[in-house]
């Protein structure tokens, strides 16, 4: 299992603490330094079953600076994937990848359900 996180993100810290407390092994990947590429994002999106917009870090500085809330509705999926792949800080985190399961963000109940 892989977990894409940003070390300064409090939500990521909570997620990692939860994984550790539940003795769940994972590979930690720094989303800022080693973010998923476009091909990987397409696979993760398909596995997640979520709308692509859920993969965007809507509370992030880059999201706000680029005014993505206004731009995303007019973007194609290909454009969105390219944008997500361009900078890990645009991607919602933590991003958990476990075989055929993908979780975006940390909601303890969702993680409990999928990982137990």
Language-model segments: which ranges?
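Thiol/selenol-based redox catalytic cores and closely related redox-interacting motifs
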Residues: 33-114
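Local sequence-structure signature of Cys/Sec-based thiol-disulfide redox active-site neighborhoods
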Residues: 1-21, 26-31
